[in-house]
């Protein structure tokens, strides 16, 4: 047997890892990937050319161990293997090698037979020479004719081939030919030059590339390559193309790929800025452009230097040439970009980067100055400049490790016990700490402090002295408590409390006191204010206590001084009030208020206040010391005076309305009379024991009655906010022309104005568009001359691009496409715009009919044509088309002369305006009919019709096959035949919506469009983890209850499915299934209707298409424009106009998808990686960034390895051989950049970390963040350059916007009724809600995608999101917080929209709501919200509160009001007080009832009704609202109220916030009962059960009157119990119920848990996980949990005395004690049974049964005895159950909270048993009514029609009938 060769390794690897015929080069272990993958890729390319060469290339795998060495007999293979992984210790390496060995043994013989030469060496040499002759030489000869990507690929291939050739020759002891060595040397040199590039090909041969010919690019390149004044390190070989960034690399030891990445970044940034500058010297870099970039990049650094008191390191030489100064600026700018590009996780700490940059820039300055110094000394080297990658290892890595170590504590620790990104960053806000850290950074500095555990010390060992100690939390501590709400918004709470006190005083004394006396009493509110101020000062100290050592001295002094001052005023105020005159007390008040007067007065002069706040001048800081903490951020945030006036008036109106309503109508004044009466009633006799026997009045009763009213008082501002914001938002939207074009009829009526509006908005021109109030009241439509000129051509091409996009998306049919397209062919005879056929529909038939009926009445005909411009255009175009058609078809001289004569006569009459009077128009109908037939015959072109055409036309019949003439004949035929049916084109609702919105937006206010060269450049970034890229065929056809996703989509998108079949030319689904290659089209069609990455990428790549078309409009001359962009695109070449358009688009736009796990998916053969690669191949401009984890084995340390992490960017690799494009195996990616990281980058929240990893690969001045569940539209992409201009306009503000908010359209509304509810709710928020937030309130933040960021501003200030674990769970909104705190501003724009998907199933929606509620809970604890609450003025602070955490806190108060009301009423009922007082407490319920229903109606429905009314009409809005109620929207929203309440409270008390992936899929499957129980048990079922028991007891002992508020609570109870099953697909199908019961019994089975058992499989595992958050809760959280659990014992206390044996007889406390004795007996019984079951249940089964029977008989005997003796009655048994059930639950809650104290095996097992019994009983009781309703088929029918639209409901029933046939067909397809 011949010895195996290394070439066989290739096939072996992939036959094992990916079983296909040809090997996959991507499935290589990460430790071998870098060396082996290039060889395998080359082998794939040459596989078909030379099989033996393929075999031999596989030889050079280099990683074969001793077993392969025995076979090969050559030491070289072993040496190479030992060099890489001698012990096969890397992950999957041994498996990789064994598979190779098996393939070697199997395929050696066959490859030897295929060998053409005598030996492997000669075979390889022959192939290499052939490749050189045919590949490399042709490439060299082609020169600039080949692309840079092709050259790069060919040279890389040649290098790999030579490596294989050299290895084979050395094995055979043959020298490589000199000619080959010479060729290889040239190739090797070229290979170093031609590296993969991202956007700019910077190799020497790409000078003629369209981008590289741009003068701005050339100018920037020339500037950065000026290095003649720089001194390189000794030994460095200088190349001609090296630049200042290369010099920085050699001096500071940055990574090569980081330099390459930032080089392109800097070039594009400077070039794009220079494009907007007025050209001075076109071939030189303009200093203005460089200064602009430098100012934006280094603005934060300069501000930081001023704050910490450091002199800036940006120092420039004096009296130097401009080139030298410019070079210095480029060096400073490039240095910052290189630091930022390699900083990894440090990018979240902008001031840390400022610190690093400050010292490195100073070292740069010293190096440059030492070169120019006259003194002779050695130039100074940087501190960290020894080895390669020193910057990473010595600067970035130490800081990163500190971050990583702190992040590890976040898993189980509290926020206060670890430092997050903000804490570590704020360390660099103090010069004191900077001096301690020093430069070079001291390893023993307090910043790097380590715990004993990190140092590896035992508890007994003493920690060594590491310096100044550990710096913990800095400036702020996130303590988990509700008091953060008061601390952050203390001014608001003080205002409410003082207002309430004042109103109560006035109402109480309104009739009994004089005005002066009442005024004096009202002044007592300032005593309360002083107490509240003291409480606030106490909270500041208490909640910041853990940061006392790390906060600066002036902050500590400020806290102490404020506390002392507040304490003094608490003493002085009561004394002054009690012992002095009112006037003296007023003076004291003025003195008390004086420290806060200056900031409030300066509110009216915001420019002065901004200046004072931003100043770092010491005297100014002293003046502002009291009102503003000395922090780096949160200063100068005040808006303009006009903006302040607007939101001030908003809140004055709102608060006035709220307080007046509360006082006069609802809460204060109406309740004073009943309250006085209650207070005057003598103390009633209590049925319960009196704990306070000496109380002489009814204050306790008043507190009980007023408590829910007070809660409503604090909560109802949210309702008033909903009312006022709806009115303001609706008014604002109306003034902005929103919804002016609502229907197709409105679109047709204004369509002729569209070209003018398009020209004014989307075409660069000098005319300024009306803005502001002028535009709001303007009804003038933009019009252009009705000529077929340049403007019309531009509009028609843009319009046709949109319509063609609709057809590609299957929104319209082929016929609708023809009716909607505008004709782009120029007619010399036509001087007007040729409108789309749908606009001219039925105009010709109507005109013919009118002409026939009114023959001779030429004046009427002229008036009709004059009034109807569309009819006039249709008639003129029809005449011109017929004239051209006949002149084209007729060639005979006599016939042509006759036709010419006829048309000449007609033209003469037209010129003289005598056509209608001289010609007989009655024959027009006959002529019309003949022309219709003629066009039909010509279009069909059938032989049998030729006899119907005159002989003269037969001769030239073949001419109709020409495209232009054919299109014109089609148009003429449509003009002649189309009737009224075209008026409803397009019929698809989505197409209608998009067309009407786009048309409407052209009449809205937007900035003028700049030319493409002058627009801001931008990038789009999409974070992706592991969601669906493209639906697989299996996923689409997989059925659940007879319903597949594909079937589901066909039913809810029937018209789009029909259009799809028409597009792929299939009449039926069966024809479609028969064609294999159309399966990919089906996958795409379905994926475009889901929430997939493919849909998002397609939408975002419309930017590329739109920019190319707009660039064509800018660059094309008149002749090229008339030909159209498609003509330019078809003739594209390296020097063509279209190449320039593409180059401009590439310069202006970049799209990066951050596929975090792309490398993992690729190496595991995951289909998602292949689908992503397909996307890159389909869209060559798409880039994918990912985190590459590479395993590296240690050569000298056996069995050990280390993982290294890289930020990588890839694109689709070019193809050098023509292969079948459908073969996915030939699609490869190409690594562009690979930047090493200091460690695993995902140490915080995953999504922001993923964004941070990819942001370094984005380009431009703006960055749009797009989630992977979003979509975009071609028509909206045309408006992007207008939107970007918003960054250059202040729009009445004082600063340029830093975030542009966009409107969103929820495209999942048609999926189900739940999706519709969520769509309407979300739609109102992203439109009218954010409209008001941005203007007038000025508190719009970042609520997720698709906002556009000022990229340069944010990359220097922490990025586009925050990533600290847990606290930044809602990472998006923190970007808005951060931007606002750093003097940015956020605007909102509604003339552009982006599609967005939402969750469509109840469980998905609930998980999303839970995540948002968790995030809001964490926001409540955050420093960002605290600083906004304190640094905003009072009115803006109110806006911030009620639009962020206030909404969730008010939702919590809504539910708490129910609890307080019920427990209070229960107290009144059970104690007998209510009976004594009569009906006086009823007033409280009436008030609460009105409040409850006002909340439901206004809070939920009013914004939705207003926005739908604006956009579609108020009739549709009202209809939608009624329909939503019929589909149980109130049930849905009430249920979600419980979700918000539970998770917000849980987060604030105990934590447990986490990201919850919802899947974003279609929910057509049934959720199991056990799954619903797990998810909703604690959040809804338990609370609903408690409320139900309270209501039941209240109705038993209370009055017969049932109020509206009580009814609403019953509604809430029913909703919380049964909504999950009501909205569960097939929730009432009997067969599903049976399966659910079996699954429930299996899950609830006791003792089926344990370590490693998931919660989905075991009740025990689920229960342990459910209470896990209590183990990490703080002490106060546990105390609060126990305190609230005591309410169940109070409930028991009340019910015990209602037993017939004790009622009205015994009121002693021993009765209550006896009830506890009974509880203990029951618990002991349960414990005995549990113990017996565990001990005796297996081996002593009989004894266990005897014990159970004995206990049962004993209890029955006791029960019968008590009943016989009349000691208890039957109703007493029921009351005992009602009392004991809550008591047991309360004991269980307390036990769970105290788990660490009682976690002894015996005790804890009792607790677990009790919990299991409760879940078993509660779940079983829930299941009974569901099973009962499943008996009735009509309930299931109703549910299906309610959940899904009618078309799907009908299809669902049909599918069940035909399910057997479809399954049979599916199985046949698989076969």
UniProtKB/Swiss-Prot annotation:
Q: An example Gene Ontology cellular component term from the record?
A: 1,3-beta-D-glucan synthase complex
Signal sequence extent: none
Which stretches are Extracellular in the membrane topology?
A: 513-521, 580-583, 662-701, 1463-1485, 1538-1580, 1623-1675, 1730-1741, 1794-1815
**Which top-rank group of organisms is this from?**
Eukaryota
Spans within the Cytoplasmic topological domain: 1-491, 543-558, 605-640, 725-1441, 1507-1516, 1697-1708, 1763-1772, 1837-1871
Q: How does it sit in the membrane?
A: Multi-pass membrane protein
What are the transmembrane regions?
492-512, 522-542, 559-579, 584-604, 641-661, 702-724, 1442-1462, 1486-1506, 1517-1537, 1581-1601, 1602-1622, 1676-1696, 1709-1729, 1742-1762, 1773-1793, 1816-1836
Location comes to: Cell membrane
**Top-level EC class as recorded in UniProt:** transferase
Matching Pfam families, A to Z?
Answer: FKS1_dom1 (PF14288), Glucan_synthase (PF02364)
Alphabetical keyword list: Cell membrane, Cell shape, Cell wall biogenesis/degradation, Glycosyltransferase, Membrane, Transferase, Transmembrane, Transmembrane helix
Molecular function (GO) terms for this protein are: 1,3-beta-D-glucan synthase activity
Among the GO biological process terms of this entry, one is: cell wall organization
User: EC number(s) on record?
Assistant: 2.4.1.34
Spell out the reaction equation it catalyses: [(1->3)-beta-D-glucosyl](n) + UDP-alpha-D-glucose = [(1->3)-beta-D-glucosyl](n+1) + UDP + H(+)
Task: Indicate yes or no for the key word Amino-acid biosynthesis.
Answer: no
Q: Does the keyword Cell wall biogenesis/degradation apply?
A: yes
Summarize the protein's role.
Involved in callose synthesis at the forming cell plate during cytokinesis. During plant growth and development, callose is found as a transitory component of the cell plate in dividing cells, is a major component of pollen mother cell walls and pollen tubes, and is found as a structural component of plasmodesmatal canals.
Q: Which family does it belong to?
A: Belongs to the glycosyltransferase 48 family.
* Stated name of the protein: Callose synthase 4
């Amino acid at each position: 047997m011949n010895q195996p060769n290394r070439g066989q390794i290739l096939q072996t690897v992939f036959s094992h890892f990916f079983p296909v015929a040809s090997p996959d080069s991507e499935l290589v272990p990460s430790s071998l990937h870098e060396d082996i993958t290039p060889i395998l890729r080359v082998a794939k390319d040459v596989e078909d050319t030379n099989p033996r060469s393929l075999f031999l290339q596989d030889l050079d795998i280099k990683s074969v161990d001793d077993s392969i060495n025995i076979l090969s007999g050559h030491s070289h293979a072993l040496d190479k293997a030992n060099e890489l992984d001698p012990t096969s210790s890397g992950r999957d390496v041994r498996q990789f090698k064994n598979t190779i060995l098996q393939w070697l043994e199997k395929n050696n013989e066959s490859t030897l037979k295929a060998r053409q030469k005598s030996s492997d060496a000669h075979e390889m040499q022959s192939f290499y020479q052939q490749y050189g002759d045919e590949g490399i030489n042709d490439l060299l000869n082609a020169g600039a004719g080949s692309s840079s990507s092709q050259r790069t690929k060919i040279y890389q291939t040649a290098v790999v081939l030579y490596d294989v050739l050299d290895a084979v020759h050395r094995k055979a002891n043959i020298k490589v030919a000199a000619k080959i060595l010479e060729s290889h040397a040239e190739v090797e040199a070229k290979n170093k030059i031609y590296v993969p590039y991202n956007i700019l090909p910077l190799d020497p041969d790409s000078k003629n590339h369209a981008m590289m010919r741009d003068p701005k690019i050339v100018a920037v390149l020339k500037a950065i390559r000026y290095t003649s004044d720089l001194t390189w390190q000794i030994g460095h070989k200088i190349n001609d193309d090296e630049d200042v960034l290369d010099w920085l690399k050699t001096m500071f030891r940055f990574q090569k790929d980081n330099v390459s990445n930032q080089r392109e970044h800097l070039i594009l940034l400077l070039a794009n800025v220079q494009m907007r500058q007025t050209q001075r010297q076109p071939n030189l870099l303009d200093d203005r452009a460089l200064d602009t970039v430098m100012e934006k990049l280094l603005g934060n650094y300069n501000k930081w230097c001023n704050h910490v008191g450091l002199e800036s390191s940006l120092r420039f030489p004096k009296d130097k040439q401009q080139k030298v100064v410019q070079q210095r600026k480029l060096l400073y700018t490039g240095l910052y970009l290189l630091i930022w590009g390699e900083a990894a996780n440090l990018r979240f700490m902008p001031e840390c980067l400022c610190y690093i940059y400050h010292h490195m820039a100073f070292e740069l300055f010293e190096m440059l100055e030492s070169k120019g110094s006259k003194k002779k000394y050695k130039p100074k080297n940087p501190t960290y400049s020894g080895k390669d990658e020193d910057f990473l290892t010595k600067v970035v890595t130490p800081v990163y490790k500190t971050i990583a170590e702190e992040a590890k504590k976040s898993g189980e620790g509290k926020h206060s016990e670890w430092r997050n990104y903000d804490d570590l960053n704020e360390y660099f806000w103090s010069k004191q700490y900077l001096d301690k850290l020093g430069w070079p950074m001291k390893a023993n500095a307090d910043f790097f402090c380590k715990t004993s555990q990190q140092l590896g010390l035992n508890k007994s060992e003493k920690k060594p002295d590491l310096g100044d100690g550990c710096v913990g939390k800095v400036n702020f501590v996130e303590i988990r408590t509700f008091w953060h709400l008061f601390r952050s918004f203390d001014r608001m709470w003080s205002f409410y409390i003082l207002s309430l006190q004042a109103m109560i005083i006035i109402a109480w004394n309104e009739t009994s006191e004089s005005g002066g006396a009442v005024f004096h009493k009202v002044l007592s509110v300032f005593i309360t204010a002083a107490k509240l101020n003291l409480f606030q000062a106490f909270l500041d100290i208490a909640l910041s206590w853990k940061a006392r050592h790390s906060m600066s001295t002036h902050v500590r002094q400020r806290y102490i001084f404020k506390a002392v001052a507040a304490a003094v005023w608490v003493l002085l105020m009561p004394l002054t009030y009690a012992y002095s005159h009112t006037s003296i007390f007023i003076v004291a008040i003025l003195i008390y208020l004086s420290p806060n007067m200056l900031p409030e007065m300066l509110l009216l002069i915001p420019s002065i206040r901004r200046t004072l706040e931003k100043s770092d001048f010491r005297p100014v800081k002293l003046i502002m010391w009291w009102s503003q903490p000395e922090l780096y951020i949160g200063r100068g945030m005040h808006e303009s005076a006009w903006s302040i006036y607007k939101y001030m008036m908003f809140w004055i109106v709102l608060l006035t309305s709220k307080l007046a309503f509360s006082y006069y109508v609802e809460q204060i004044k109406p309740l004073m009379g009943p309250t006085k009466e209650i207070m005057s009633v003598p103390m009633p006799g209590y049925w319960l024991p009196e704990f306070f026997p000496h109380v002489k009045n009814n204050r306790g009763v008043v507190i009980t009655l007023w408590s829910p009213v007070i809660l409503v008082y604090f909560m109802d501002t949210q309702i008033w906010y909903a009312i006022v914001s709806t009115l303001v938002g609706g008014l604002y939207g109306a003034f902005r022309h929103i919804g002016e074009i609502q229907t197709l009829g409105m679109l047709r009526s204004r369509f002729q104005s569209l070209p003018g509006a398009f020209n004014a908005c989307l075409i660069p021109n000098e005319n300024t568009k009306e803005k502001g109030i002028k535009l709001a009241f303007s009804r003038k439509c933009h019009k252009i001359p009705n000529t077929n000129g340049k403007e019309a051509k531009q509009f028609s091409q843009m319009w046709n691009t949109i319509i063609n996009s609709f057809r590609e998306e299957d929104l319209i049919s082929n016929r609708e496409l023809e009716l909607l397209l505008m004709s782009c062919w120029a007619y010399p005879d036509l001087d007007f715009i040729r409108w789309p056929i749908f606009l001219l529909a039925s105009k010709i038939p109507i005109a013919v009919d009118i002409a026939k009926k009114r023959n001779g009445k030429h004046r009427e005909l002229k008036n009709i044509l004059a009034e109807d411009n569309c009819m006039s255009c249709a008639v003129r175009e029809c005449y011109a088309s017929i004239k051209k058609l006949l002149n084209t078809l007729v060639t005979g001289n006599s016939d042509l002369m006759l036709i010419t004569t006829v048309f000449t006569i007609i033209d003469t009459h037209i010129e003289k305006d005598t056509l209608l009077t001289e010609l007989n128009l009655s024959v027009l109908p006959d002529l019309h009919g003949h022309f219709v037939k003629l066009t039909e015959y010509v279009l069909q072109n059938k032989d049998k019709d030729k006899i119907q055409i005159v002989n003269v036309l037969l001769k030239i019949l073949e001419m109709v096959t020409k495209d232009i003439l054919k299109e014109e004949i089609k148009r003429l035929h449509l003009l002649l035949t189309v009737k009224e049916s075209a008026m409803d084109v397009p019929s698809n609702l989505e197409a209608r919506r998009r067309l009407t919105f786009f048309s409407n937006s052209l009449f809205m206010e937007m900035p003028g469009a700049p030319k493409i060269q002058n627009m801001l450049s931008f990038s789009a970034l999409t974070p992706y983890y592991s969601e669906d890229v493209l639906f697989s065929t299996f996923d689409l056809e997989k059925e659940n209850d007879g319903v597949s996703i594909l079937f589901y989509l066909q039913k809810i998108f029937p018209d789009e499915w029909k259009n799809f079949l028409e597009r792929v030319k299939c009449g039926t689904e069966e024809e479609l299934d028969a064609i294999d290659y159309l399966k990919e089209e089906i996958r795409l069609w379905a994926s475009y209707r889901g929430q997939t990455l493919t849909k998002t990428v397609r939408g975002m790549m419309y930017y590329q298409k739109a920019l190319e078309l707009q660039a064509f409009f800018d660059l094309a001359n008149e002749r090229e424009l008339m030909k159209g962009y498609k003509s330019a695109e078809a003739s594209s070449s390296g020097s063509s106009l279209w190449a320039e358009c593409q180059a401009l688009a590439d310069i202006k736009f970049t799209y990066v998808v951050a596929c975090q796990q792309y490398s993992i998916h690729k190496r595991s053969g995951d289909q998602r990686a292949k689908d992503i690669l397909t996307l890159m191949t389909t869209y060559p401009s798409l880039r994918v960034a990912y985190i590459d984890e590479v395993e590296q084995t240690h050569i000298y340390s056996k069995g050990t390895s280390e993982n290294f992490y890289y930020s990588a960017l890839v694109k689709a690799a070019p193809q050098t051989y023509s292969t079948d494009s459908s073969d996915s195996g030939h699609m490869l990616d190409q690594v562009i950049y690979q930047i090493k990281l200091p460690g695993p980058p995902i140490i915080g929240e995953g999504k922001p970390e993923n964004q941070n990893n990819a942001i370094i690969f984005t380009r431009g001045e703006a960055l749009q963040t797009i989630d992977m569940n979003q979509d975009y539209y071609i028509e909206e992409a045309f408006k992007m350059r207008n939107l970007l201009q918003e960054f250059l306009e202040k729009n009445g503000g004082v600063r340029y916007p830093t975030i542009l908010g966009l409107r969103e359209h929820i495209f999942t509304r048609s999926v189900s009724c739940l999706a519709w509810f969520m769509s309407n709710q979300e739609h109102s928020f992203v439109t009218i809600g954010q409209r008001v937030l941005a203007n007038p309130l000025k508190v719009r933040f970042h609520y997720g995608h698709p906002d556009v960021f000022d990229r340069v501003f944010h990359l220097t200030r922490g990025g586009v999101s925050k990533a600290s674990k847990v606290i930044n769970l809602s990472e998006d909104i923190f970007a808005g917080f951060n931007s606002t705190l750093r003097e940015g501003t956020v605007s909102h724009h509604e003339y552009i929209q982006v599609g967005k998907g939402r969750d469509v199933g109840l469980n998905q929606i609930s998980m999303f709501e839970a995540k948002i509620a968790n995030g809001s809970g964490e926001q409540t604890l955050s420093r960002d919200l605290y600083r906004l609450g304190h640094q905003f003025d009072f009115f803006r602070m109110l806006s911030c509160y009620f639009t962020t955490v206030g909404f969730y806190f008010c939702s919590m108060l809504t539910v708490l009001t129910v609890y307080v009301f019920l427990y209070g009423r229960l107290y009144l009922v059970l104690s007998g007080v209510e009976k004594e007082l009569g009906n006086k407490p009823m007033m409280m319920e009436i008030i609460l009832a009105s409040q409850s229903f006002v909340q439901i109606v206004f809070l939920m429905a009013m914004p939705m009704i207003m926005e739908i009314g604006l956009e579609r009409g108020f009739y549709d809005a009202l209809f939608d609202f009624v329909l939503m109620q019929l589909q149980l929207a109130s049930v849905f929203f009430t249920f979600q109220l419980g979700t918000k309440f539970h998770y917000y409270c849980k987060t604030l008390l105990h934590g447990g916030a986490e990201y919850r992936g919802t899947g974003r899929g279609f929910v057509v499957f049934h959720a199991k009962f056990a799954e619903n129980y797990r998810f909703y048990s604690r959040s809804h079922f338990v609370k609903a059960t408690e409320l139900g028991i309270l209501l039941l007891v209240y109705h038993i002992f209370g009055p017969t009157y049932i109020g509206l508020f009580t009814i609403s609570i019953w509604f809430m109870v029913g909703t919380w119990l049964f909504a999950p099953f009501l909205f569960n697909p097939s929730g009432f199908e009997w067969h599903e119920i049976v399966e659910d019961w079996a699954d429930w019994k299996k899950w609830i089975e006791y003792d089926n848990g344990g370590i490693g058992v998931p919660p989905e499989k075991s009740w025990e595992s689920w229960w342990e996980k459910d209470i896990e958050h209590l183990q990490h809760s703080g002490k106060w959280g546990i105390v609060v949990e126990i305190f609230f659990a005591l309410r169940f014992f109070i409930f028991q206390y009340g019910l015990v005395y209602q037993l017939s044996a004790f009622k009205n007889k015994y009121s002693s406390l021993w009765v209550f004690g006896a009830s506890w004795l009974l509880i203990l007996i029951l618990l002991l019984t349960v414990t005995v049974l549990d113990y017996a079951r565990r001990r005796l249940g297996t081996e002593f089964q009989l004894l266990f049964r005897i014990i159970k029977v004995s206990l049962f008989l004993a209890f029955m005997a006791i029960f019968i005895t008590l009943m016989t003796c009349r000691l208890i009655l039957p109703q007493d048994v029921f009351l005992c159950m009602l009392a004991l059930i809550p008591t047991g639950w309360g004991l269980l809650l307390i036990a769970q909270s105290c788990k660490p104290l009682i976690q002894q095996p015996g005790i804890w097992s009792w607790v677990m048993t009790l919990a299991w019994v409760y879940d078993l009983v509660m779940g079983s009781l829930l299941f009974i009514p569901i099973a009962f309703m499943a008996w009735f088929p009509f309930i299931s029918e109703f549910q299906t029609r309610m959940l899904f639209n009618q078309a799907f409901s009908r299809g669902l029933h049909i599918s069940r009938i035909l399910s057997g046939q479809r399954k049979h067909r599916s199985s046949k397809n698989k076969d």
